[in-house]
Amino acid sequence: MTNKMWGGRFSKATNELLEDLNASIKYDYRLAKYDIEVSIAHIMMLAKSGVIQKEECNLIVDGLKKVQKEISDGKFEFKKKLEDIHMNIESRLTEIIGPIAGKLHTARSRNDQVATDIRLFLIEKINGLVELIEENQKTLSQQALDNFDAIMPGYTHLQIAQPITLGHHLLSYVELFNRDKLRLTDSLKRLDESPLGAAAMAGTSYPIDREYSAKLLGFNKPMSNSIDAVSSRDCLLYTSPSPRDVEESRIPSSA
C-alpha cells in the first residue's frame, strides 16, 4: 500500500512520470511564507473557538515559526514526493513537534488553504507592482519633459506614418501605466475577502470563527459562498499586464 495522504486504496507506487506531473512544489514553494501565515491564523482561531487547547496552539505556532526560519535561512528541503507546499510544511512541522501537528488541519482543507495563500500572495505582489508603476511613471514623465521637442517617427500597422515627438510618445506609456495602476488597485478590493474556513467546499461542522481568522490575515471579511471560495481563480487575472508595451518592442525592427 502506498503511504501517500490520498493513496489509501492504491496497492502500488505511483509511476514516476505521474509524480512529476502531479507535484506542484516546483511552483508553489513561492507560497511558503503565506502558507505559514495562514496556518498560524487558523490555529489561533481554533484555540480562540475552543476547538483546541491554548497550549497546543502555542506549540504549533512555535513549530511553524521554526519552519519559517528554516525556509528563510535556505535550510528547508522541499520534497517532490510530498507534492505541494502545504504537505511539505506540515511534514516538517510533524518532525519538529510530533503528531500534534495534525491538529493544524482541523476544520481546514488544502482547498481553502491554497485559495487563501494565493490571495495573500497577490495582494503583496500587487502592492509592489503599484509602487514600481509609480516609479516608472515618474521616470517616463521626466524623460518626456527632457525630450519634449525631440522628433521621432510614429508608426501605424508597423510602418512609419507621421512625425511625433519623443516626449509625446513617452507620455502615452504614462497613461497606459496609469490604467494598469487603477486596475490593480481596484482589484485589491475584490481580493479583500478570505476563503479560509470554506474547507474542501462545504464548510465545516466545527464551531469556527471565520471573521476572526480573516481579520488576523488582514482581510476585510470572509467570502460568502464556500464553493466559490475554493473554486474561483479569476483573481489571478487581475495582475495580467497590458500587452502593448511588449507588442511595441517589435516596431524598431520593422524600419
Locations of regions flagged by a protein language model:
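Conserved small/polar residues in nucleotide/adenosyl-binding loops
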Residues: Y238-D245
